């Protein structure tokens, strides 16, 4: 079991649904570091795409 945090109210819990507000919870731990970084190229590509979309819409 891992500690989770509610995305709506910020309360900590071990459940999938927040007992305080009924909101969704997410794992609070960062992903494990790996020097190989199998998904690094995908993450960088997605970040570039999101950045280019965001800057293009603001003009």
Curated annotation (Swiss-Prot):
Pfam families the UniProt entry points to: Nop10p
Name of the gene encoding the protein in the UniProt record: nop10
Protein name according to UniProt: Ribosome biogenesis protein Nop10
InterPro entries: H/ACA_rnp_Nop10, H/ACA_rnp_Nop10_sf, Nop10_arc-typ
Gene Ontology terms, MF aspect: snoRNA binding
Family under the similarity heading: Belongs to the NOP10 family.
Record keywords: Ribonucleoprotein, Ribosome biogenesis, rRNA processing
Single GO biological process annotation from the record: pseudouridine synthesis
PANTHER family per the UniProt record, alphabetical: H_ACA RIBONUCLEOPROTEIN COMPLEX SUBUNIT 3 (PTHR13305:SF0), RIBOSOME BIOGENESIS PROTEIN NOP10 (PTHR13305)
């Amino acid at each position: 079991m891992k500690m989770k945090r509610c995305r709506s109210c910020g309360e900590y819990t071990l459940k999938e649904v927040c007992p305080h507000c009924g909101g969704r919870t997410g794992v609070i731990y960062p992903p494990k570091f790996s020097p190989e970084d199998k998904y690094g190229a995908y993450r960088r590509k997605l970040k570039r795409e999101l950045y280019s979309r965001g800057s293009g819409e603001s003009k």
